[in-house]
From Swiss-Prot:
Removes 5-oxoproline from various penultimate amino acid residues except L-proline. The keyword Protease applies. Belongs to the peptidase C15 family. The active site is at residues 78, 141, 165. GO terms for biological process: proteolysis. This is Pyrrolidone-carboxylate peptidase. SUPFAM superfamilies: Pyrrolidone carboxyl peptidase (pyroglutamate aminopeptidase). Gene3D superfamilies: Peptidase C15, pyroglutamyl peptidase I-like. One of its GO terms (molecular function) is pyroglutamyl-peptidase activity. Homotetramer.
Length: 212
């Protein structure tokens, strides 16, 4: 399959974003998949247009977006995105939407159509911390996953799409002893394992939910 893997620019006064750092280190061929890479702006208003133009000019079987989730201690494939922008902080264009629908004609939520449990289990099988997430937040990451679901629903019915959040890397948590992080090479290994699992046509039937 031809897979587009995206990462984000740094945001919130940081000078690095582990999502893009990890994406740049992925191999160009993973299993049977050909990998293209794209850096996305951490911008509510710009990210949709860049994705739209990229999909209009290239054929991809899969789009897999990667984002930073500071505070998480595992690599977390996302199950679902919701139709709301509700930003705790401004994006890189100083835009801070609050309680704003992403697409007025979109569904309340879009579920990733990738085998997210198989991807999660593949990460775990590498001896790495992996968990299935049921919330992509309400910042640009959720916005991006939702927009991909919207495009699949409205324009690209054969497109497969998903999102994975990754933790901080160690250099981002210097002086923050209680904040989890993960070495970049382990994030790259986890993403590689997840991408290899995308070949599964059907997801695994595993108890990877929560008790919350």
């Amino acid at each position: 399959m031809h897979i587009l893997v995206t990462g984000f620019a740094p945001f919130d006064n940081q000078n690095i974003n582990p999502s893009w750092e990890a994406v740049t280190q992925l191999e160009d061929i993973i299993g049977t998949h050909t990998i293209d890479k794209l850096k996305l702006p951490t911008s509510f208003k710009k990210v949709d247009n860049i994705i739209n133009k990229t999909l209009a000019s290239n054929h991809y079987d899969v789009v897999l977006a990667i984002g930073q989730a500071g505070g998480r201690n595992a690599i977390t494939p996302e199950r679902v995105a919701i139709n709301i922008d509700d930003a705790r902080i401004p994006d890189n264009d100083d835009f801070q939407p609050i309680d704003q629908a992403i697409h007025l004609d979109g569904a309340p939520a879009y579920f990733s159509n990738l085998p997210v449990k198989a991807m999660t289990q593949s990460i775990i099988n590498q001896g790495l911390p992996g968990a299935l997430s049921n919330s992509a937040g309400t910042f640009v990451c959720n916005h991006t996953l939702y927009h991909l679901g919207y495009l699949q629903d409205k324009h690209y019915p054969h497109l497969r799409f998903g999102f994975i959040h990754v933790p901080y890397i160690p250099e981002q948590v210097i002086g923050k002893p209680d904040t989890p992080s993960m070495p970049l090479e382990k994030i790259v290994a986890g993403l590689t394992a997840a991408i290899e699992a995308i070949s599964n046509d059907e997801d695994l039937h595993l108890a990877l939910g929560t008790t919350e």
